[in-house]
């Protein structure tokens, strides 16, 4: 699993750091004041992701963030394919809760700094790898098929010609 992480300034109008969000992820406006913005970093993100299927826990939310950030900046969001590790965990493990730390623990990934984006991404990857091994799937498409899940695709809107 390749790893990459970076901070970026949120798009204007989406750059308020609410106290309850900061309590969750620990980031403040001061942390990103010198970071490049979404438009400047989107090429690096797309180069890193390539044509891979993206994975996130409650992936629909994360994909909407990618789409909305692109819309807010006038950038074109790639129509990434994605699979949700929460859905995979629900069909793989018998847990009282499928929150990321518990699902990751079921996959053998313990004691990570939850809500650290890079650590959360690695936890999702570990869930997918463990689930694929348990179900005898050789890739994410086979895993989705085995579990009767659909690989989603980010719904993108055409850029307006202004």
Segments and roles (model prediction):
Residues 1-79, 94-97, 101-111, 115:
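Conserved non-catalytic scaffold segment of RNase H-like nuclease domains
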Residues 88, 103, 123, 127-130:
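Generic recognition of well-ordered alpha-helical segments
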Residues 125-162:
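Acidic two-metal-ion nuclease catalytic site recognized across multiple nuclease folds
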Residues 1, 32-33, 53-55, 65, ...:
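Extended aliphatic helical segments
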Residues 76-89:
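Conserved beta-strand -> loop -> alpha-helix junction used to position metal-binding or nucleic-acid-contacting
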Residues 120:
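Conserved catalytic/binding loops enriched for acidic/polar residues
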């Amino acid at each position: 699993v390749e790893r990459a992480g970076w901070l970026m300034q949120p798009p204007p109008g989406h750059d308020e750091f609410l106290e309850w969000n900061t309590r969750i992820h620990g980031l403040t406006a001061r942390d990103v004041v010198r970071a490049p913005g979404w438009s400047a970093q989107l090429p690096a993100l797309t180069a890193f992701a390539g044509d891979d299927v993206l994975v996130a826990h409650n992936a629909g939310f994360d994909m909407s963030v990618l789409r909305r950030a692109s819309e807010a900046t006038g950038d074109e969001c790639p129509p990434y394919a994605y699979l949700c590790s929460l859905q995979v965990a629900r069909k793989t493990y018998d847990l009282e809760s499928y929150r990321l730390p518990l699902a990751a623990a079921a996959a053998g990934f313990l004691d990570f700094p939850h809500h650290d984006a890079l650590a959360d991404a690695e936890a999702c990857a570990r869930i997918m790898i463990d689930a694929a091994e348990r179900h005898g799937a050789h890739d994410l498409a086979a895993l989705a098929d085995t579990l009767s899940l659909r690989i989603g695709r980010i719904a993108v809107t055409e850029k307006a010609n202004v």
